[in-house]
Amino acid sequence: MSKLRGYRVMLGLTQQQMADKLKISLQSYNNKETKKTPFNDKERLAIKSMVAEIKPDITIDELFYS
């Protein structure tokens, strides 16, 4: 399980719900979560804000690059 998927599950969100929050399609979100395509900066910041609710000290590097 990817780190991002783990945090999404801890937030109690489905891929569809994450896609809706980011205003992208489910297919696009799936491709990004599985690292087939990259998230853009706006999406990275939005995801960081969501994850910060459960892990306030999370960094973008930790979420997307480790």
Give the location of each predicted region.
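A short, Lys/Arg-rich alpha-helix, primarily the initiator
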Residues: 1-10, 58
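The alpha-helix within a helix-turn-helix
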Residues: 8, 19, 48
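Residue-level detection of the helix-turn-helix DNA-binding "recognition helix"
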Residues: 6-9, 23, 34-36, 52
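Short alpha-helical DNA-recognition segment
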Residues: 12-31
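Key DNA-contacting residues within the recognition helix of helix-turn-helix
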Residues: 5, 30-31, 48
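DNA major-groove recognition helix of helix-turn-helix/homeodomain DNA-binding modules
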Residues: 42-58
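Short amphipathic recognition helices of helix-turn-helix/homeodomain-type DNA-binding modules
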Residues: 60-66
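Residues within the helices of the helix-turn-helix
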Residues: 5, 16, 61
